[in-house]
Amino acid sequence: MAAQQRDCGGAAQLAGPAAEADPLGRFTCPVCLEVYEKPVQVPCGHVFCSACLQECLKPKKPVCGVCRSALAPGVRAVELERQIESTETSCHGCRKKFFLSKIRSHVATCSKYQNYIMEGVKATIKDASLQPRNVPNRYTFPCPYCPEKNFDQEGLVEHCKLFHSTDTKSVVCPICASMPWGDPNYRSANFREHIQRRHRFSYDTFVDYDVDEEDMMNQVLQRSIIDQ
């Protein structure tokens, strides 16, 4: 049991910089960067969501996205799943405690959490307005595998699906890196799975940049609630 917990922690530490400061980081899948859903432990000891693992197993010679060892079907991580069901966390809005497995459904309807998100958006916009206007290109992106560039989000997803389906190299997501919250040094454990899950459509689908600040924040808030 202890060995399994250590392995789960090892996978989470590689899930991203936030995991180091987040005590719940050990419950984070290194592929989708979400709380494990139906966690499965593979032979090398690392853990993935069941759906993420199925995608990782699709290449002819699949490898673990964390340690790059040969990847094979694993076994259900029953103890980790039990911990997710029994570990408590607090809502950032109302401060009430919920089990980790229930927090998403709660924040979708918590008005105080919605206010918390709104204040965060306002603070981000205010801070950005004080910075020099050096806005990165967020409309076209280079392929992280080859010299091809000028893809929109959908085009990059399709390009990688067609021409890089067998590439296993860890690369930086150019879409995430261009965003204010993105880490330009973080290498995705499975980039193709990452963009297919996270960037299936453009951010322009969600935000109209021509509307005023208040309307834009409301749009972002509503979309974040829908996507919970």
Curated annotation (Swiss-Prot):
Keyword Kinase: no
Record-linked CDD domains: RING-HC_RNF114
Catalysed transformations (reactions): S-ubiquitinyl-[E2 ubiquitin-conjugating enzyme]-L-cysteine + [acceptor protein]-L-lysine = [E2 ubiquitin-conjugating enzyme]-L-cysteine + N(6)-ubiquitinyl-[acceptor protein]-L-lysine
PANTHER family, sorted: E3 UBIQUITIN-PROTEIN LIGASE RNF114, ZINC FINGER, RING/FYVE/PHD-TYPE
Gene that this sequence comes from: RNF114
Name of the protein this chain belongs to: E3 ubiquitin-protein ligase RNF114
Zinc finger (C2HC RNF-type): 91-110
Location of N6-acetyllysine modifications: K102, K112
Source organism of the structure: Pan troglodytes
